[in-house]
From Swiss-Prot:
Sequence ranges on the Cytoplasmic membrane side: 1-20
UniProt name for this protein: Probable N-acetylgalactosaminyltransferase 7
The organism of origin for this protein: Caenorhabditis elegans
InterPro entries: GalNAc-T (IPR045885), Glyco_trans_2-like (IPR001173), Nucleotide-diphossugar_trans (IPR029044), Ricin_B-like_lectins (IPR035992), Ricin_B_lectin (IPR000772)
List of glycosylated residues: 135
GO terms, biological process: protein O-linked glycosylation
One Pfam short name: Ricin_B_lectin
SUPFAM superfamilies (alphabetical): Nucleotide-diphospho-sugar transferases, Ricin B-like lectins
Region described as Disordered: 61-108
Lumenal compartment segments: 39-601
Domain Ricin B-type lectin: 477-595
Underlying gene: gly-7
Annotated S-S bridges: 146-382, 373-452, 490-506, 529-542, 568-583
Domain notes: There are two conserved domains in the glycosyltransferase region: the N-terminal domain (domain A, also called GT1 motif), which is probably involved in manganese coordination and substrate binding and the C-terminal domain (domain B, also called Gal/GalNAc-T motif), which is probably involved in catalytic reaction and UDP-Gal binding. The ricin B-type lectin domain binds to GalNAc and contributes to the glycopeptide specificity.
Keyword Disulfide bond attributed: yes
Length: 601
């Protein structure tokens, strides 16, 4: 009865003209909406097709609340089969020294003298390098699994940017040769060599003539004045036409099948930056070897509060989603020298901050910017690149000589990206408090434009393992030069690690004489802690995860006291040695006056 009554009411309602008109209108709207939605879907499909044509999937890992840089389903492990980009034939060694990355010994006096002269001029032994083939073979020290990965057939093209200033001839050109020798030719758009105002004759007309053999694949761009590594890299990126810009230092050798593993994560998400494993090339013998010992030992990049680069084991959280030890993994930061990044993404990020000079701090500026602005950084175990570590810096900072360039750079990074966490940098580097970072308004505007996240978000979601090794620093109680008026000497770490603390003439430049003593009793110089070892004070690595100690400063007696030993730091009568002795208030060699030292820009 109820159903019949409802049916009769509906029939009466339908007979009313207004109701019928309203129904027809609703049906029409639904049909029109369906047509528009379908057209929009087709339009979106077209956009996706265009994106695919650019070789980027541009997937957003954050749709699943995942950080960018997770496992790539399009990179497939083939088990016992060789991967699709693995070389089919081994490289043929030359009959020159140094093949297979072996060291080249020099024992004659004339050769050793030539090596010393070369090292003084270039920071490494180019005398030995000149004996070695440009196309020498090097050992494949990748993890065994790396030989069995398939990468997408369509990978983005690459512009390799190599910046140099007064570089040695063969190390520079061996870098270029190795890239062209060990890369799929269809992926190398160009090699861009950026000459940062070199004045050595071999880097002028001779170099221009040499690169013509590469038939336009290698170009030389010259700066009009000394720009420094950071700005010169941005210049190189602006001259690049490849979809990805890949930066190498000017003294590298790339290893077997190094390139596809770097490109696959970028293809999946264009906002991911990739970093190869860096192997070592000895600056004297030119031996190629692993830095980490085992090829299966992987580390991610972190930092301590003075913004010194450190490495640590991969976190359990990051390991959990990796089925294979050879898969890429996320890293909070990177060492700065070697990496690949989508060219247009790099441009959106403003390249490097134009206010950063020469070198120093750029790896943090880029790392913080990438992570906080929606991108990610991954280390790639299957991509290996050898790098020569110089014995010393063989050239000056040019017009920036005498300026605290690195401190200025760091302050720009700190003030732009670290928010309230900047206080920990200034606790670690108090002398930089008054350093003027220059105008950072453009960087702050970029951060606002890109809607970048806070540094607190970065520390909690990306760099969460930093605090395990490097906790937030308590305030300094006293810091600066600790001068003993009786001798006129200042406490000095003396440079040895481990090594005893001494006392030397106060020079006013900070360095080994810039001591910090925090409110929890830890005394340190730079990243080194000063601890009691018998009656001596020893400089050594700080115990990771600690910020406390046994030191205190008595402002009344002016003594530096070790509470556990109940002894005071004492300068010897000769004024050079420092020991712990029984505290005596009238002992003038136990009194210290602290003078804070500030850098100026």
């Amino acid at each position: 009865m109820i159903i019949a009554r409802k049916k009769l009411q509906l029939q009466r309602l339908w007979r009313q003209r207004g109701c019928r008109v309203a129904t027809y209108i609703c049906l029409g709207v639904l049909v029109l909406f369906g047509f528009v939605y379908n057209s929009k879907g087709n339009s979106m499909s077209s956009i996706k097709s265009d994106s695919a044509a650019q070789q980027f999937d541009d997937l957003d890992d954050l749709t699943n609340k995942e950080l960018p840089g997770g496992p790539d389903p399009n990179t497939i492990f083939r088990g016992s089969e060789l991967g699709n980009y693995e070389p089919k034939e081994p490289e043929i060694p030359s009959n020159q020294p140094g093949e297979h990355g072996k060291p080249v010994p020099v024992t004659d006096e004339e050769g050793m003298a030539a090596g010393r002269a070369a090292e003084k001029e270039f920071g490494f032994n180019t005398y030995v390098s000149d004996m070695i083939s440009m196309n020498r073979t090097i050992p494949d020290i990748r993890p065994e699994e790396c030989k069995h990965w398939d990468y997408p057939e369509k990978l983005p093209t690459v512009s390799v940017v190599v910046v140099f200033h007064n570089e040695g001839w063969t190390p520079l050109l061996r870098t270029v040769h190795s890239v062209l020798l060990r890369s799929p030719p269809e992926l190398i758009e160009q090699v861009v060599m950026v000459d940062d105002d070199s004045d050595k004759p071999h880097l002028k007309e001779k170099l221009d003539k040499y690169v013509t053999r590469f038939n336009g694949k290698v170009i030389v761009v010259r700066t009009e004045q000394r720009e420094g590594l950071i700005n010169a890299r941005s210049i190189g990126a602006k001259h690049s036409t490849g979809e990805v810009v890949l930066f190498l230092d000017a003294h590298c050798e790339v290893n077997t099948n190094w390139l596809p593993p770097l490109l696959a994560p970028i293809k999946r998400n264009r906002k991911v930056m990739t970093v190869p494993v860096i192997d070592g090339i000895d600056s004297n013998s030119w031996e190629y070897r692993s830095v980490y010992g085992s090829p299966n030992a992987h580390h991610s990049g972190i930092f301590e509060w003075g913004l010194l680069y450190k490495e640590t084991q991969i976190t359990e959280r990051e390991t959990a989603h990796r089925k294979h030890n050879s898969q890429p993994f996320r890293s909070p930061t990177h060492a700065g020298g070697l990496f690949a990044i989508n060219r247009l993404w790099f441009k959106e990020l403003g390249y490097y901050d134009e206010g950063l000079q020469i070198w120093g701090g750029e790896q943090y500026e880029l790392s913080f910017k990438i992570w906080q602005c929606g991108g990610g950084i991954v280390f790639v175990p299957c991509s290996h690149v050898g790098h020569v570590y110089r014995s010393h810096m063989p050239y000056s900072f040019g017009k920036f000589s005498g300026k605290p360039v690195i401190s200025i750079n760091m302050m720009r990074v700190v003030k732009t990206w670290m928010d309230d966490y900047s206080k920990y940098y200034l606790t670690r580097e108090p002398q930089a408090t008054n350093v003027n970072p220059g105008d950072i308004s453009a960087q702050l505007a970029l951060r606002d434009k890109l809607q970048c996240k806070s540094f607190k978000w970065y520390m909690e979601n990306v760099a969460y393992d930093v605090l395990k090794s490097y906790p937030m620093l308590p305030p300094n109680d006293v810091w600066g030069e600790a001068r003993n008026p009786a001798t006129g000497k200042c406490l000095d770490r003396m440079g040895g690690i481990p090594g005893p603390m001494g006392a030397t003439g106060c020079h006013g430049y900070g360095g080994n004489q810039l001591i910090r003593l925090n409110v929890q009793g830890q005394m340190a110089q730079g990243e080194w802690c000063l601890t009691a070892n018998g009656i001596r004070i020893q400089a050594n690595h700080c115990v990771k995860g600690t910020v406390n100690g046994f030191w205190s400063y008595d402002r009344k007696t002016k003594q530096i006291i070790h509470s556990q030993k109940r002894q005071c730091i004492t300068v010897s009568e000769s004024g050079s040695e420092v020991t712990l002795q029984t505290c005596t208030e009238d002992n003038e060699r136990q009194k210290f006056v602290w003078k804070e030292f500030y850098q100026s820009s």
